[in-house]
Amino acid sequence: MTSFRLTFLLTVLLAPALARAQQPASTPAPAAQPPSVAQKAAASSPTERRTIVAMRMTSGESIVLDGRLDDTIWGRTQPAGDFVQQDPDNGQPATEQTEVRIAYDQNNLYIGVTCFDSDPDGWLGYQRRRDEQLPADDRFIWTIDTYLNARTAYYFEMNPSGLMGDALQGVGNVNNRQWDGIWTGRASRSDVGWTLEVEIPFRTLNFNPGSDWGINFQRTVRRKNEESLWTGWARNQGVRRMTNAGLLTGIRDVSQGHGLDIKPYAVATSVSSPGRGDSQFRNDGDVGVDLFYNLTPGLRANLTVNTDFAETEVDQRQVNLTRFSLFFPEKRDFFLDGSTFLDFGSGFAISGAFTPFHSRRIGLDEASGTQQRINFGGKLTGQAGNQDIGVLHVQTGQEGASPGHRTVPVAGEDFTVMRLKRRLLRQSYIGAMYTRRASRGGAPIVDRHTVGLDFRLETGSFLRSQNLSAAGFFLHASSPLNAGKNSAMGLEIGFPNDPWSGELELSEVQSNYDPAVGFATRTGIRRISPTIAYTARPRQNPLIRRFQFGNDVNWILDSDDNRMLNRDFNITAFLMELHSQDTIQFRVLPSYELLENDFRISPGITLPALRHYSFTRYRLLATTASRRVLAVSPIAEWGGFYSGDRRRLALNLDVRMRPGVIFYLSTEWNKVDLAEGSFQTKLYRGIAETQFSPWMSLVNNVQFDTQSSILGWQSRFRWILKPGNDLYFVYLHNWLDDPLLARFATLDHRASSKLLYTHRF
């Protein structure tokens, strides 16, 4: 416990500095900026924040949303400009100019963007599908902090092909990209560059009427690998750090509606599972509804009845050569919407290893693994005063029947999650959490609870312009099946800056910690995790943009007797990124492990318990720029592995034939030779995306791995009839590579169609 006492002492000593850094001053202290830019960018003024004024449209004005910015209102709206580079030439004016105009009427916020370009045909815009990542495209990002609290924000982005992406930002830069707001954008190209025209209904945003908002803008010119921002352009800042955002003023007397959204849906399915003893097709139809109501401008209630997840994308398979379960993220929209208000321990890099709430535990029976139908669920998320509030309650059915499987009788369950955070100072909070999982129908485990406390102190003004954070948590999970050692706790100090960054995390997960609605990768351990990294940027080098060196360390000790169980180093011996965005890196990974129990690593191969293993692996990775038509990422890894050796080869290919037609191909091969035996694993994945427009897409995903011997194919068609109204067609087919039949035999297949409609009041 000496390490915990040391970190606790450091946290206490740093707390006053963090608090002082967050105290409001008579004039905000700006980040240090080069004098050349102070003369060019209003953002560098030491006495005022950059401001953009939204222009109110007159009763006779309207906007035709076509992306052209030729409506009358745009001519009388004062633009925001003078963007400053964050990369590569930090602090210098952007090489391509950008202008942003904002207008509004009674019901909508309008944003007009002109991205001037000296090479009007040089833009890149491969992606069209909603919410796709944009590593290869030009893009324009804007973030809106409607409460001006510098903690939460709405994140939006578009590219020259009209792709629309959005997310909800939470504390610790948590980004919930599964949020789909109702808004519309159009893109257009011209001989001066490309333009955007955006309409965001005020009903989509939560805000207090009559108040100013925080806002910031960022533009990416992909062929130059250039990032520029309106404000907050220092490398320690960025578009997602709302403490460095500008001000949006002038929005007054607008309508937020009655705050009620009704989303009914209808779904039809056809399922057959011949590989599981049920070869007959089962045809079914169902209806359900989601209700959303804004109780206040900042607090939203959600009720779902007869919930269905037919449109959910499949998980991406992974090869697991460890003793511990893999963590798969949530993909169901009901649980993702507003999930930032239910996060615990935000910012902890290792919090996923022992989180008290993981919504994928809901709707899955623990004993049989049977999927359970969700009868209804309710949520309350948002802000009230200085509090962030998240409440969730879900009831599953008395009988679980995974579609296409034989009905397995299981007890229905009730799940309850409550989360409260009290905002402190400018960027900090203290919080509490409670979860409950209660069985119905006389199950052996009647009631299980988890309670937790956490805090986070954060500032972007440490030593005037540096980021510094301190965080901690405590969790206790009750269970009638064990007594004592049911807790988890941790402390963290972070210094995420440039060129130096570092972090120290300490945690303990006791042997009986088992959160009923959470996830614990490993219990009975203490973890010490220091991290340090340094980034060097050669000046005026025509080829190289940056070098990076660093080390991530994990020491894992037995929580009872402090025996060393694991010691892992991840040494970045060399990382080089070129201005072209091509990278190459070399890592050294020394490891030590004490096996506490027998480890069946592969069928017929078991590593015996109580053996000590020390080995070192090496990893060489290269990545070509994503903006290229063919982007390649090969990985080679070799070296020791337990009692022998392991070789790993992986290859990722991204083929962007033209805007809207993209192929992702990946393969991974592991060859393991141990004293106890040898084996191989293989993983293949192919994804073909046909994006007809920003409103219509078809995605085919094919995967096969030798660990499960299952070949899976999902075909997913989505048509956004209008924002908020969606039509899905999804087909899923799984085959088993049966060595006795020497062929692939069908396990199950399922076809689904789903129509969702949104009506707003």
Q: Which ranges hold each PLM region?
A:
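Bacterial N-terminal signal peptides
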Residues: T7-P16
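Positively charged n-region of N-terminal signal peptides that target proteins for export
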Residues: M1-L6
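Exposed, low-structure sequence patches enriched in small/polar residues
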Residues: R373, S461-L468, G472-F761
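Extended, hydrophobic alpha-helical segments in both membrane/secreted and soluble proteins
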Residues: P264, G285-L291, L299, V305, ...
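Structural preference for beta-rich elements and adjacent junctions enriched in aromatics
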Residues: Q22-R423, A432, I445
